[in-house]
Structures are given as C-alpha cells and as structure tokens.
Amino acid sequence: MSRVGIIGAGSWGTALSLVLANNGHSVEIWSIVESEIEMLKEKHEHIDKLPGVKLPDSITFTTDIEETIKNNDILVLAVPSVFTRSTAVKMAPFVKEGQIIVCVAKGIEENTLMTISDVVESEIPCADVAVMCGPSHAEEVGRLLPTTVVAGARTQKTAEIVQDLFMNEVFRVYTSPDVLGMELGGSLKNVIALAAGMADGLGYGDNTKAALITRGIAEISVLAIEMGAKAETLFGLTGIGDLIVTCESRHSRNRKAGMLIGQGYTMDEATKEVKMVVEGIYSAKAALALAEKYDVRMPIIEEVNRVLFEDKPAKEAVSELMLRDRKIEHSSLEWK
C-alpha cells in the first residue's frame, strides 16, 4: 500500500482518488478552496464537479499543502494546466528528494511553450516527475467504466511504479518513455476538439468530424515529430485515442465549448456556460506559437485561433479550410 496525495480536487483528481482508494492505497486530497474541502468532508462527493460519485470514507481532505506533501509518498498533480506553475511553487519547499509527482493535466504553458512536466521539473528539480494521460473522462472513471491510459516517465522504473499504483480490472495502464509525445498529443488534441465542437454547433455531419479528427492528428503528428516525439505515440492511446474521445464525447468540455461557439456564442460566453476550465483555449495560442517556432503549418489550429481571438465566424473558418490549395494527402507518397 502507498500513501498518495492528490493536489487538486477537480473532477479528474476526484475520480483518480477513487481508483487509488479502490486499490487499497491511503489517499488524501488537497485543494486551495476551503469551501470545496468542507463540502468533500461533509458529503464525500464532489457535487459540483463529479456528482453521483461517492468516495470511500477512507479518503481524507485538507487545505494544508505542506501536510499533504510531507505525509504522502507519491503526489498526483491534478490542477488545471493554467495553475500548474503557481501550484508547483507552493509545493516546492516541501517536496522530498526523488519524490514522485504524477502530472495528469494536459496543456502547454503559453508564455514559455513548456509542457506540464517541464514546468514542474523547472520549479521542483528534486522531484521524479511522471505523466499519465489517455482517453479518460473523469465521469466514466468515476463510474468504474473500463478505461485505458499510459504512464510516462524518464525511467522505466518510475513509469512502472505509476502503472502498479493505478492499474486494476477497470483501469488499465500502459507505460511509455515518450513523455514529450504523450504531453503534446494530450494538449494539442484539445484545440482540435474545439474545432470538432464548432462543426457540431454549425450542424455539420459525421463526414466533417471524421475529416477534422484525421487531419487534426496529422497536424499534431507533424509538429510533435519535428519536436522529437515518436510517431507510435501519436497513433496510440495518448494521441489518436485521446483525440477521438475528446472530439466525440458528451463529457468533453472542449467539444462543448466549441459547439457553443459554432452556435454563435462568444468565447467568453461559451467558457462561462461550460463552467469548468477549457484547456484548449489556453493551449491554442501556444500551439500556434510552437508551429511558428518549428516552421510547421497547422491550418486547423490556425483557424481555431482566428475564431477564438479574432472573432472570425466558425462557418467562414471551415470554408477556408475546405478551399485551401489543392495538395496530395501525404507528402511522403508519390506516383511511380
């Protein structure tokens, strides 16, 4: 049995606490929001973020981050990506040498273009940082529906520790050394999911969605491979797998925000309606900046940025994508 501290009491942190508790681990959840912790203590259910999912009485809750870090062997960092650095700064004075921190948020820091694990490593250099991601909505994990994810780390030993920590009959965990590919797939798919949602909001059909998913993973792969990621990762669970579920699921906040924008909502109106952090909005500018840095064309992500930040109508953005210059589907293919 391990002692695990979960930093962040949102839907994902709450769902993962259930997985860990069911595996027999000691689990403590930290949140900076006192009212959230009081509600969890009283109800043993996150009635705002994960209603209907009852947590075991063995799970404890606190607003004392020092206590959570010092009292637990392994930490799971589950705050939204936009709060990663500020939370890591709070954690840094208390993290022990070699303590494992599992990052489960998906995003790219806009001003530095760093992945989540890179941000954590820069603020807490003594930590052993891992990541875990894949097609995994908290709502389904909380209902104990079969889910498969990937644990990535710099060393095989750390990845396997994380694998053993979480894996059970309804939560399968693979391992991977390609942390960069995992994080790029997990963050950039949120931007493509916004586009998929916009297509839904405009009333377009399955043909449009299939094209966005297929061309979306092509865009993500070109950039990620240019940055050093492996193609196998992008066409695995943390790439195409995560992209499919985020573009298709009713649980996807990125798809929902995009759908509202397609229906005529502004970006601000859509995010207020979703009522949770829409990671794709924060990753969109960073994705575009990475494309420029590595001299890679990403037409879908370019158009999403124009819709989000330049008030371009979503329908016009789709039309421009359809009317781009004629080209071969894959530049690596040629006629003999």
From Swiss-Prot:
Catalytic activity entry: sn-glycerol 3-phosphate + NAD(+) = dihydroxyacetone phosphate + NADH + H(+); sn-glycerol 3-phosphate + NADP(+) = dihydroxyacetone phosphate + NADPH + H(+)
Pathways per UniProt: Membrane lipid metabolism; glycerophospholipid metabolism
Active site (catalytic residues): 189 (proton acceptor)
Binding site residues for NADPH: 11-12, 106, 138, 253, 277, 279
EC supergroup of this enzyme: oxidoreductase
Principal location: cytoplasm
Single annotated GO MF: glycerol-3-phosphate dehydrogenase [NAD(P)+] activity
Single GO biological process annotation from the record: glycerol-3-phosphate biosynthetic process
Enzyme Commission number(s) of this protein: 1.1.1.94
Pfam assignment, any one: NAD_Gly3P_dh_C
Positions that bind sn-glycerol 3-phosphate: 106, 134, 136, 189, 242, 252-254
Superkingdom assignment: Bacteria
Gene3D superfamilies attached to this UniProt entry: N-(1-d-carboxylethyl)-l-norvaline Dehydrogenase, domain 2, NAD(P)-binding Rossmann-like Domain
Location(s), subcellular: Cytoplasm
GO cellular component, one term: cytosol
Keywords: Cytoplasm, Lipid biosynthesis, Lipid metabolism, NAD, NADP, Nucleotide-binding, Oxidoreductase, Phospholipid biosynthesis, Phospholipid metabolism
PANTHER family: GLYCEROL-3-PHOSPHATE DEHYDROGENASE (PTHR11728), GLYCEROL-3-PHOSPHATE DEHYDROGENASE [NAD(+)] 2, CHLOROPLASTIC (PTHR11728:SF1)
HAMAP family on file: NAD_Glyc3P_dehydrog (MF_00394)
Function: Catalyzes the reduction of the glycolytic intermediate dihydroxyacetone phosphate (DHAP) to sn-glycerol 3-phosphate (G3P), the key precursor for phospholipid synthesis.
Protein family (similarity comment): Belongs to the NAD-dependent glycerol-3-phosphate dehydrogenase family.
Protein name: Glycerol-3-phosphate dehydrogenase [NAD(P)+]
